[in-house]
Curated annotation (Swiss-Prot):
Membrane topology listed for this record: Multi-pass membrane protein
Full protein name: Vacuolar protein sorting/targeting protein 10
Protein species of origin: Trichophyton verrucosum (strain HKI 0517)
The gene coding this protein: VPS10
Biological processes, Gene Ontology terms: Golgi to endosome transport; Golgi to vacuole transport; protein targeting to vacuole
Subcellular location: Golgi apparatus, trans-Golgi network membrane; Prevacuolar compartment membrane
Side Lumenal, residues: 26-1349, 1423
Length: 1486
């Protein structure tokens, strides 16, 4: 039941005056009793099957009546908000103040007080109480636990009616009962043993570095500290947003990065989950669908249209499984809050009313914003819809989007009685001009009941209709009510004691009572609660002769109709009978008669859909039985496509049976078994330059297409949906200048022309729609023409060029919130503008940052400004308007470069409001003419490359790494190579945490002083840039021969493996690793003392994330990973060939395959960015022609990849997979960043394919004790040659007491040690190198002593004497055994087993090492914001057994982004294919 309160705010106070009583004679009408109130009540709640009512007010006063509103009393000692238990109508809970609450299980006769340790959640998407569907004593409580400025969500539970309240889950995003509805589980044969105890919780952090929310469950209230993740199709369901109980169904909504499409999963047993498919209408988008009132055998969902600027939806109805939805009706009316004009007629199966937008297509196209609303009714469960008829005119009624009363809009449990406010004509008018209409045959026919709009209610099972004039909006008062005793045919009036305007009119929920309650306001703003009692209007109680057997549904002939295998009848009082039923609280129940089975009793079976003729036809090809279909003309007996709807009780005998198998032809069946061959398809294109783009699929994307678009030099656009097997040419009037994929939605792409004209597609390039910008796109070098919003896919910023001279324009920024239909000016004279608001962060949706030229003159310097109202009224000028060089949005940071005289400075913000100055390493100055490039921020730190030497062809610089809030940088790697386009030889290895490769210049002095050519070496880090090492060379080459140099396990200056990096890559989107082929790396290089020219290189591969390497091919090869690494393809680089090589065992063995009958030069090899496909495209050039030939190479036919691999989470190594853990080469255990991570990897010998993307990271993980590898040098400290950290000479550490000044709640601070913990590390205990000696904050000595209690005098004696005695002996022993290297805490190899290792506090503590803790006061808000950020503002605090919170990340670095995981590449937004002018400056180049 939808409850709408239209009452004014205010406190509910009983008036001090004596309540009035107004009584009419028995024959004249109802008896009316009045209570006067000073303030209006805000809610009315009836306890079902009782005369008990509770009223609540704004100040939390509660009043109770036990005689159907005849008298009222204050509910003594209880204030708060009443939450009724909708499944157990005698039960309700009062949400009280000060953590005290009350519960009743006997309709407010008695109350029990209870307390909850934390404040119950209120708002923010959480309800304080979640009731069990079957057990009134089982309740989940949603609470909020806060410390300082950080809060986390906590769920409590009770199973004994609040006698005890226990903690269930910490840091969740909401918990739910499996039995959330009384109907759940009914009729299901196999249900869990403890289904009634099963609880689901949305868990936001499934892994240390994985923020994709899972749904987990427990049958023991998590008492065993075990949570089982919900799966569908053998994969964890990720990105869970919400869960709901709908009759017999559990629904789960999930979303994913890279698409606005949402996935809906359904379960009928709380065990097995299947994704729901939606056919024939718009795709389901996150937050853009509404689950409507449904039945036990079907779910109704309204899906919002993405095309429309005003709210319009499409009505979908599911089959009995809840997993196959078909669109029944398009253009359904809804409001901006997704409230939908849809309501079922109460108590009668298959009848519902809906309002639709008749001019929906015009509205969607933007031709008009005015909706033409018309009403429709369905009598057959949504199969067909008809107009409402009042005589020979069409009738249109206001619905849920325009509520006028509480409760249902049209009907009640009174059988067949339906009322509404509306008008006849061609469309729905305003509510104020509407009249009141009534139907007594469930909507088949209608008559006008009363002039003007009225609030109305049903009583005595429909024998009595009551209405009161409803013009509260215009403050029109009335002193009478209307009532009908004959189903609305005739109406009588009764006087009210005051002239009032009605606020609420209601009665008992079952509509069996003769007593009604009216809440009203008079002209003097006094408020009344009136009890209107019709009990004495009829003296006689109805007898048998006064009732009729009323058929609930009639067919076109007026005969009783069948639905779900039966006819439905009610015992109903005849309209003209002069009696009352007087069976209070006895709701009428339907009688049924069975029908013979007809076509309507069957639904489409799995794999079949209804066509326009309502026949079930195959949605996909039917699989023939084993041994059948040897020839295409063969036939076989297969499924009919129909099945009887579960719960349908029709009689099969003598009826229709559509479930019998039917004969089918083999040519229409699924294709034959795999051929064992690799297939090739070729397509030529007349273009010299290669410009292509994949439209990647995300986790929640539906469909299975593999779409690629290609733009030719002439501006033609080609699209393939089968990965290059077939192509279609786009039909556009103007040549396409460039295409821009949506940065945050992979299904969306924009095509731009040279002028104002542009096109967009939101359905993966299936259809395109045109729009125009206000100005032609900018031609200013380095400026992008389109920017996108991360959460609102239809919001755009358009940068248009004005007064362009060559490649320099006066640029204007416009914004649109409807995909270019309408534009409004943002600013003139801009550099660039971008949305920076993002869900889960402390930023507004409308927050925009712009760099703008002073005085709007493009020859002037840039300044940084921002606004959260589109620059209409509020504009914030940052850095006092001082010049900036540029800014970038990187994952969780906004980084700004400012110009200060001859130096560059960097500032960082995580909330878009407060910027903190980034402290660079001591004595490190960045020349204002130099550049720095933001490389990566995927591990909660910013990697920054700063140019030290900018001479053309001799560029190199330093890689700096920030702390967790981007305010303090330390040197990670000096002399890192870069090129003249500001690309850097730095690449993160995807999936595996903290591993990166970089090339350094080993002769910097010679390059600087003598202009010599750069010489390079390749280094690798396994701990996020804290330590770098040379790559170990392979022991043998591919032919089994030794290299010219040898080492044991580590690379040396004379002998190591060196690989060519990003600056030499021909295709920026290629990468050495893969987001799905975990641990695999391929590169081109050589073994020796330094990197040799690329032409002299060979091809190498690592299978363990860079620990060991193997030569796989002599010479230079291009490579691609397919099927998540189970297929690796390489092909010769820059030389004619017709052969590719592939490996099915991670590079152990290779097979050659001839893909062409003539030699071609392979320009590039590609596959889907996720590397999950078994298809590849070789982009080849025949000879020196100006033609590109696309070769689709399909490995799906291989026998070795015929079946899908099996992964069982409960036994992950039992079948086709094993668990693999990355490691640090200098550690004996597998701890990396404080934890052991285990990844699912397919066994190389397993003959199967991976299929959909795996959840690579296993849930089997553990945190480790802290060691040196979990720390890096703090600010103002530098790494020494032995790996330790020491204070830089001449510098002082920052004041460690700054934390006490910044945080008034702080009790202690720690003396600096020179070390800081890696932001990505989750280690616990062990060696806390950054927290050795604690000191009390000023005036906090007492609290400090309580936290660190001391010892008594006797203990003090032993604390002094005993260590001195022991130290004398131990010191001598240690001196004789130790290597003399006291005095450093090192970040070298870790051997923590010995207490005399360099890790040992016995060695390290006596030596004082002072470190500089960052003391930038303005950084504190950044730190708080960083801690505060999580899904919709909630996060964890330390101490939860579910682990500590980890911040979100998604790498967007200064390299070209094709992989969807953590690798740093150029943002898709910045990669404007087909426009070379834009390649100079990337978004992250500051």
């Amino acid at each position: 039941m939808i409850v709408r309160s239209l009452l004014l705010a205010g406190s509910l106070l009983l008036a001090s005056v004596v309540p009035a009583s107004f009584t009419l004679a028995k024959s004249d009408g109802p008896q009316i009793k009045v209570k006067e109130f000073d303030k209006v009540p805000t809610d009315v709640h009836y306890f079902e099957d009782t005369d008990t009512i509770i009223l609540s007010g704004k100040k939390a006063e509660l009043y109770i009546s036990t005689d159907a509103a005849a008298s009222w009393n204050l509910l003594e000692g209880k204030t708060g908000i009443l939450y009724p238990n909708k499944y157990h109508t005698q039960s309700a809970v009062i949400y009280g103040p000060n953590r005290k609450h009350w519960v009743t299980f006997d309709a407010a006769k008695t109350w029990r007080e209870f307390e909850v340790p934390d404040k119950l959640a209120f708002g923010g998407g959480f309800m304080p109480f979640t009731f069990h569907g079957k057990d009134a004593e089982k309740v989940l409580l949603s609470a909020e636990e806060c410390q300082f400025m950080t809060c986390r969500h906590v769920t409590y539970y009770t199973t004994d009616g609040f006698k005890t309240v226990k903690r269930l889950f910490e840091g969740d995003m909401g918990c739910f009962w499996a039995v959330g509805n009384p109907a759940f589980g009914e009729g299901e044969p196999h249900l869990p043993d403890k289904l009634d105890d099963r609880v689901f919780c949305i868990w936001p952090h499934a892994t240390p570095l994985d923020l994709t929310r899972r749904l987990v469950y427990s049958d023991t209230y998590f008492s065993d500290r075990k949570a089982v993740a919900v799966e569908a199709g053998g994969r964890d369901i990720k990105g869970v947003n919400n869960m709901a109980s709908v009759k017999k169904f559990l629904l789960l909504a999930a979303s994913s990065v890279g698409t606005s499409e949402a996935a809906i999963y359904v379960s009928k047993d709380a065990v097995h989950w299947d994704r729901a498919d939606f056919y024939g209408g718009p795709k389901v988008r996150g937050g853009k669908f509404t689950v409507l009132e449904s039945t036990n055998y079907s779910i109704q969902v309204n899906v919002a249209s993405r095309r429309s600027r005003v709210p319009i939806g499409s009505l979908f109805t599911s089959d009995s499984t809840g997993t196959s939805f078909t669109m029944n009706l398009d253009g359904v009316n809804e409001d901006k809050d997704m409230i939908t004009d849809f309501e079922q007629v109460s108590g009668i199966q298959g009848i519902f009313l809906v309002n639709i937008v008749e001019n929906a297509e015009e509205v969607k196209k933007g031709a008009t914003r005015e909706k033409k609303l018309v009403s429709r009714i369905s009598f057959d469960d949504g199969r067909t819809f008809k107009p409402l008829k009042c005589g020979d005119k069409e009738l249109h009624l206001h619905s849920i989007t325009r509520p006028s009363n509480i409760g249902r809009t049209y009907s009640s449990p009174a059988p067949g009685l339906v009322m509404g406010i509306g008008n006849t004509g061609d469309k729905l008018g305003t509510y104020e001009t509407g009249d009141t209409f009534v139907s007594n045959d469930a909507g088949v026919t209608w008559r006008k009941a009363l002039d003007k709009a009225h609030k109305y209610e049903f009583g005595d099972q429909g024998s009595l209709l009551v209405a009161v004039f409803d013009e509260y909006k215009d403050k029109i008062f009335t002193d009478e009510i209307s009532y009908s005793l004959n189903h609305g045919k005739d109406w009588k009036k009764a006087k009210l004691p005051h002239r009032v305007t009605a606020l609420q009119l209601t009665t008992t929920p079952d509509s069996t009572s003769l007593q009604f309650l009216l809440v009203a306001e008079d002209e003097k703003k006094k408020f009344y609660v009136m009890s209107i009692d019709f009990s004495d209007v009829h003296e006689r109680k109805c007898e048998k002769k006064d009732f009729e057997r009323w058929p609930a549904r009639l067919d076109e002939k007026g005969e009783p109709d069948c639905l779900m295998g039966h006819k439905q009848f009610y015992k109903r009082r005849k309209a003209d009978a002069d009696c009352f039923v007087k069976e209070k609280f006895k709701e009428p129940l339907p009688e049924t008669e069975p029908c013979q089975c007809t076509k309507e009793d069957f639904e489409c079976a799995a794999g079949f859909l209804r066509n326009k003729d309502y026949e079930c036809e195959p949605h996909r090809k039917v699989s023939p039985p084993e041994g059948k279909c040897k020839n295409p003309d063969d036939k076989f007996m297969g499924p009919s496509g129909y099945r009887l709807i579960p719960g349908d009780d029709c009689l099969k005998k003598g009826g229709v049976d559509l479930e019998k198998e039917v004969e089918r032809t083999c040519k229409d069946a699924t294709k034959a078994p795999v051929s064992g061959q690799i297939s090739v398809e070729t397509t030529p294109f007349k273009t010299k330059n290669l410009n292509y783009r994949y439209l990647e699929r995300s986790d929640t994307s539906s469909g299975d297409d593999e779409t690629v678009i290609l733009k030719t030099d002439d501006g033609d656009l080609f699209v393939t949906r089968d990965h290059g097997k077939t192509w279609q040419r786009g039909k556009f009037k103007e040549p396409i200048s460039l295409y821009i994929p949506h940065k945050y939605d992979n299904d969306v792409i924009y095509l731009l022309t040279e002028g104002k004209k542009a096109y967009w597609s939101i359905d993966r390039a299936h259809t395109f729609h045109s729009f125009e910008g206000k100005l032609p796109i900018t031609r200013t070098l380095g400026t992008l023409p389109l920017y996108f919003h991360p959460d609102h896919p239809d919001w755009l910023i358009w940068i248009g060029g004005q007064d362009c001279k060559g490649k320099k324009c006066t640029d204007l920024a416009y914004y649109s919130k409807n995909r270019g239909d309408e534009w409004d000016l943002l600013l003139r004279g801009v550099g660039k503008c971008m949305f920076v608001g993002k869900e889960g962060e402390l930023t507004a949706d409308d927050l925009i940052f712009c760099s703008q030229h002073e005085h709007e003159d493009p020859s002037k310097s840039l300044r940084l400004i921002s606004s959260d109202d589109m620059f209409t009224k509020k504009t914030s000028i940052h850095f006092d308007g001082k010049p900036i060089v540029g800014y970038a949005k990187m994952s969780e940071f906004i980084v700004v470069a400012t110009k200060n005289g001859t130096e560059l400075s960097s500032f960082t913000s995580v909330d878009g409001k407060t910027f903190a100055h980034a402290a660079f390493p001591p004595n490190y100055h960045i020349d204002a003419e130099y550049a720095y490039t933001v490389l990566d921020s995927s591990t909660h730190s910013i990697f920054l490359h700063v140019t030290d030497h900018p001479a053309k062809m001799h560029e190199f610089g330093s890689i700096l790494k920030s702390n967790s809030n981007g305010t303090s940088y330390v040197l990670s790697l000096p002399n890192a190579n870069r090129n003249d386009r500001d690309y850097v030889d730095f690449e993160k290895i995807q999936v595996v945490e903290g591993v990166a490769l970089a090339n350094i210049v080993i002769n910097p002095d010679e390059v600087k002083g003598k202009g010599q050519e750069k010489k390079f070496r390749t280094l690798i880090t396994h701990n996020d840039g804290s330590e770098w090492a040379l790559l170990p060379p392979p022991k043998k080459d591919v032919d089994g021969k030794s290299f010219d140099c040898k080492v044991k396990d580590k690379g040396t200056d004379d002998c190591a493996l060196h690989l060519h990096g990003f600056t030499e890559r021909r295709e920026n989107r290629d990468s050495m690793s893969s987001g799905s082929a975990v641990g695999l790396i391929i590169g081109v290089g050589n073994v020796g003392s330094s990197l040799t020219p690329r032409a002299e290189s060979d091809t190498y591969m690592s299978r363990d994330a860079g620990i060991t390497w193997h030569q796989i091919k002599k010479g230079r090869y291009q490579w691609e990973f397919g099927d998540q690494g189970s297929i690796v393809v390489v092909v010769a680089e820059e030389k004619p060939t017709k052969v590719l090589s592939y490996s099915l065992d991670e590079g152990e063995t290779w097979t050659d395959f001839e893909f062409s009958d003539k030699e071609v030069t392979v320009e590039d090899i590609s596959t889907v960015p996720s590397d999950t496909s078994r298809n590849f495209i070789l982009w080849c050039r025949p000879g020196s022609s100006n033609e590109i030939v696309a070769y689709n190479v399909d490995f799906s036919g291989l026998k070795e990849r015929e079946k899908q691999c099996v992964l069982k989470k409960e036994s992950p190594e039992a079948d086709d997979y094993y668990l693999w853990s990355p490691k640090h080469p200098m550690q004996k255990n597998n701890c990396l960043f404080g934890h052991v991570s285990m990844y699912h990897r397919k066994r190389p010998e397993a003959k199967c394919y991976n299929g959909p993307k795996l959840d690579r990271l296993s849930s089997e993980k553990k945190n480790c004790e802290c060691t040196r590898q979990d720390y890096e040098c703090d600010y103002n400290y530098g790494r020494q040659s032995d790996g330790s950290c020491a204070l830089v000479k001449g510098l002082k550490p920052a004041d460690p007491m700054q934390i006490c000044k910044d945080d008034p709640e702080a009790i202690e601070y720690f003396e600096p040690t020179g070390y800081r913990k890696l932001p990505v590390s989750t280690c616990e205990g062990g060696h806390q190198l950054d927290h050795l000696v604690a000191r009390p904050c000023p005036n906090k000595k007492k609290e400090f002593d309580e936290k660190h209690p001391g010892i008594g005098g006797f203990g003090l004696f032993f604390a002094i004497f005993f260590p001195v005695a022991i130290a004398t002996g131990v010191g001598y022993w240690a001196f004789s055994k130790w290597d003399g290297k006291f005095g450093r805490i090192r970040l070298g190899e870790s051997q923590p087993e010995s207490i005399f290792s360099r890790d040992s506090p016995l060695i390290s503590v006596p030596v004082t090492i002072v470190a500089g803790t960052v003391a930038v006061i303005t950084a504190l808000p950044l730190l708080f914001s960083s801690l505060w950020r999580s899904f919709r503002g909630y996060t964890r605090l330390p101490g939860s057994w579910w682990g500590q919170r980890q911040r979100p990340y998604a790498s967007r670095g200064a390299f070209a982004a094709r992989r969807g995981e953590y690798v740093g590449v150029v943002d898709d937004e910045d990669e404007l294919l087909g426009a070379e002018e834009f390649e100079g400056d990337e978004e992250e180049d500051v």
